[in-house]
Structure formats: C-alpha cells, structure tokens
A protein has these predicted regions:
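Zn2+-dependent metallopeptidase catalytic core
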Residues: 24-139, 146, 254-342
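Sec/Tat-exported extracytoplasmic proteins
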Residues: 72, 150, 154, 231-232
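Sec-dependent N-terminal signal peptides
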Residues: 3-12
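Bacterial Sec-dependent N-terminal signal peptides
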Residues: 12-30
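Active-site recognition of the HExxH zinc-binding catalytic motif
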Residues: 136-160
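Short, solvent-exposed loop/turn and secondary-structure capping segments
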Residues: 90-98, 151-154, 160-162, 239-243
Length: 342
C-alpha cells in the first residue's frame, strides 16, 4: 500500500493536468504563473519549422494550432508563437508575422471572413502571430503585428525601396508608406504636422519608416486607433497620403521627397470611402484574450521562462511602466487591454 497510494495519486493528478500531452502531437509545459507555456517539438520538426518557415505554410500552421486546442480552451482572440531564439534566425525574413483567421468588422476595407474552424476554433480565434525572437514580445514588433488585424486594408499607400532619384513607387500593401498621421504609426508613416511644402511637388518631413517606426517604442496613431475600434472617427485629424513618388533623400533628422499625387483624408472622406466602422468605437471589443506559446526544441531554462513570463506580464499590464516602450494598454491610450494567461 505504501507504493500503491502514491501511484494512484500521481495517476489522478496526471489525468487532470492538461500538460501531460497524452492526446497531443507536441509536448506542452505550463509556467507556474499561468501566463505563458511552451510547445516542445523534436529536433527535426523544430528545425524544419524555422528553416522552412513552417508558420508560413498553411498545413504546418494548422497542424500546430489544432494540436493546441487539445490542451487549451477555445477562448483566445489571438495566439502568439514566440521562437526560443536569441534573435531572428537567418533563414527567416521577418521579426513578426500575423495571419488573420477571422474578422467580422465592417468598414476596414475588406470583406469579413471566418476560417476559424480550420484552426480548431469555433469562431473565437481572430489571428495567429509568430515572433521570431524570445524577447520580441516586449521590444517589438508585437504591437505592429497586432495592428495588422485591422490595418492597413483601407488605403492604397505607396513606398519605394531606397532613397534615390527617378524612382517609381509601388503599392505598399498593409502599411502606411508615405502617409501622414497624428504621430508616426506602428505601421509606418510620418508625423503629419512636420510636413513642409517646398513647391513643385517637393516635400520635407521628419524622418520616418514607411514600414514601421521603432518596434514597441511608439504607440498607435489616431487612424490606427480608429480602425482598431478604440477612437471615434471625428477624433482622427486630417492627413495626407502621397503616391507616385519619384525621389527620396535623407538628411540627419528629416526626409525630402517628391510625389506627383497627394490625397488628403478627412473624417468624412474616410467614412465615404470605407463606410462606417461596425461595430463603432462605442461598442467595439476592447479587451482581448491572448495565448503566448514559446516554440522550442529544448526545455526552457529558468532564465528563459523568467524572460518570457515577465514580458507577458508587462505587455498585458494596464498601467504605464515609465519607460520608453509601450505595452498594449499604453499604446491604445488606456482604451484597449489584453489578458494573457490560461
């Protein structure tokens, strides 16, 4: 009996513990603080996931997410995969990537869609994201990728590959490119009130990124917040979008560019173009459930657990930490919030 009783107790505990992996392809471990978890692949699966970008392969991504739902409840709006890598692997070409799963919001510039059943979710899951370094939840591009759930599908923005003369700009899907905003946006663009008109379609603005503006070091701008359902359209300041860009030069703190087409957007012209956002900022969802999973081929060390758990706590905190980085609550001006945990 002295041997049998511990055996029975252990068996009972294991049957109740979702981390036992009895019905899963991969091995799952939960952190003691119930915020983050790890998904352990064998060496060949993990190496293929990283070297062949398994996240971008629909079949591979669906396999992993469906397996998750054998362990975790279908209550999450977003699932974040975080690679257990010190920095972006050389085989991957992105710091973060979001794949939309479902979106029923109207007025964003696209038709609603719902592929959640393919992932094992009954309409709850909105998107899955991969961050290619262990610390990218805190330092970015976590905010940037979240913005892609709502933007940019609204405006036909333009960009160019590099500074130069006699350039031909191109449609810049998903980002703001050479577009102004209340501040430089998470998805790129310049500060509108820095715009100087030089004449002959020549302009000067504060330096900016057409693609992004510094990881989690900037909050969302007004138009981004509107698209996310966090701000009234009337609170979005007028801004300009420049296309047909033919030259771009960089100075110490400013950029000069020439663009043959300038389109000014106002709150009324945006509604005319996109239709009203439904649901509006009044009754839109502002609190989201987020699952953070570290993908790894080795068991996480105590230090690695501490890093990702602390970053998850910080990213979901509903207060300012007084640093130059923005968590989700800060980036939305205290309107939006995240719950990370299981």
């Amino acid at each position: 009996m002295k041997i049998l009783i511990p055996f029975i107790l252990t068996l009972f505990y294991s049957c109740e513990d979702k981390s036992t992996n009895s019905d899963t392809i991969f091995d799952y471990t939960m952190h003691k603080n119930n915020r983050v978890a790890s998904l352990k692949m064998n060496d060949s699966d993990y190496d293929a996931w990283v070297n062949e970008d398994g996240f971008a392969i629909n079949e591979d991504r669906l396999r992993v997410v469906n397996d998750l739902y054998n362990v975790f409840e279908d209550k999450y709006d977003f699932i974040f995969f975080v690679l257990n890598e010190p920095s972006i692997p050389e085989n991957l070409l992105y710091y973060g990537r979001l794949v939309g799963v479902s979106n029923s919001v109207q007025g964003l510039g696209f038709q609603s869609y719902d592929n959640s059943l393919q992932y094992g979710s009954d309409g709850k899951l909105k998107a899955v994201m991969q961050l290619t370094g262990l610390e990218y939840l805190k330092y970015g591009p976590a905010l940037h990728e979240l913005a892609h759930q709502w933007a940019n599908f609204a405006l036909p923005t333009h960009s160019v590959n590099a500074p130069g003369e006699d350039l031909t700009s191109y449609l810049y899907t998903g980002h703001w490119g050479f577009t102004g905003g209340s501040i430089p946006g998470q998805l790129g663009g310049f500060r509108q009130n820095s715009l100087i008109e030089n004449g002959n379609n020549s302009y000067t603005v504060e330096s900016f990124g057409p693609f992004a503006n510094g990881g989690n070091g900037v909050p969302y701008n007004e138009f981004e917040l509107y698209l996310m359902g966090m701000l009234d359209i009337e609170s979005v300041s007028d801004f300009d979008m420049f296309t047909n860009i033919t030259s771009w030069s960089t100075n110490e703190s400013t950029y000069d560019f020439t663009a043959n087409q300038r389109t000014t957007y106002t709150s009324s012209s945006l509604v005319e173009l996109l239709g009203s956002r439904i649901p509006s900022h009044i009754n839109s969802q502002k609190r989201f459930e987020l699952l953070v999973i570290v993908l790894t081929k080795e068991s996480l060390s105590d230090e690695q657990w501490d890093i990702v758990d602390a970053h998850a706590e910080w990213f979901s905190k509903e207060e300012s930490d007084g640093t130059s980085l923005y968590n989700f609550w800060e980036a939305t001006g205290g309107v939006g919030s995240l719950n990370i945990g299981y």
